[in-house]
Amino acid sequence: MKFIDELDIERVNQTLNFETNDCKIVGSCDIFTTKAVASDRKLYKTIDQHLDTILQENENYNATLQQQLAAPETNQSPCSSPFYSNRRDSNSFWEQKRRISFSEYNSNNNTNNSNGNSSNNNNYSGPNGSSPATFPKSAKLNDQNLKELVSNYDSGSMSSSSLDSSSKNDERIRRRSSSSISSFKSGKSSNNNYSSGTATNNVNKRRKSSINERPSNLSLGPFGPINEPSSRKIFAYLIAILNASYPDHDFSSVEPTDFVKTSLKTFISKFENTLYSLGRQPEEWVWEVINSHMTLSDCVLFQYSPSNSFLEDEPGYLWNLIGFLYNRKRKRVAYLYLICSRLNSSTGEVEDALAKKPQGKLIIDDGSNEYEGEYDFTYDENVIDDKSDQEESLQ
């Protein structure tokens, strides 16, 4: 990529570089063309290989997930599981047992009723001297049984055929009730099985639909589908600009998800609000100059906001605001940023205070001259008298 050096862009860069009481702001707007050079082509190939590995890993993951979902469907379905089969068998077994016991109970009751009726007929007589009517034990009395009982009681006699018919009717009623209950239970269990089966089928369908999506739908962060060359090129352009701007840093770990696609209006308002917070008045001519070189209405803006910024290793680093303006028509990319760091004076304030403080002479006394006398030239015999020397010279 080729760097575009313009005089008005240099004026913008000078405006975006300033200092506050405790911070230093480094800002710039660097414009590059998307025409690739030899080093850029090598970088593009490396990025393509990296993205191909990501795509292959995603396809392998989807294939294994499809196999895991297909295995339980072929071997065992929800409705053919042993839980449901045992449940149906147990229901049918207990239902048959209940019917058998119920029929035995009815037969015993009928025999007991017949024996009791014969004994009662011999011991007790009705008001007309005839045997009274014995009422069969039944759960319910229908209209026909009630009429027969009333007529037989009034006449004082009851035929055995009426008793047999009433007992048969009672058995029919009981059978109908038991069959209706069993049919209701079987219908309820089948409905439960059907609902559970449909629920599992719906879940499997949703999983299959998410797995069977084409690899083209795999998004490359804010740049679009991962297998489209245009999406990969945009990502490669931004990495190439970062490499050119910061050659001492390694950007091999930068992922497409570290970038966020935002609107131009949102980024401009955030940029100007940052300048306001730093005590600087935003200049309209700055955006006019950038618009003359980039045509902002045709630009797509990507903001670089990773979880861990590469600038954190820099001394005194505080925060950054980084954006990339990409114009496909003009084949240009603008790198616009603000980086805030602490001033050097604030970091070394203690050292500066110590350097400015006046220091006295350092005297080292080890006690070696404690008993030595001081040199006093007044009482020294070897002192040369300057006056005597002068007089001798005059003579």
Swiss-Prot record:
Mod. after translation: Phosphorylated by PKA in a TORC1-dependent manner. Phosphorylation at PKA consensus sites RRxS/T decreases upon rapamycin treatment.
Gene Ontology BP annotations: negative regulation of transcription by RNA polymerase III
GO molecular function: RNA polymerase III core binding
Residues that bear Phosphoserine: 90, 209-210
Bias (Low complexity): 106-131, 152-166, 178-197
Compositionally biased residues, Polar residues: 69-84
Protein name as catalogued: Repressor of RNA polymerase III transcription MAF1
Organism: Saccharomyces cerevisiae (strain ATCC 204508 / S288c)
Gene: MAF1
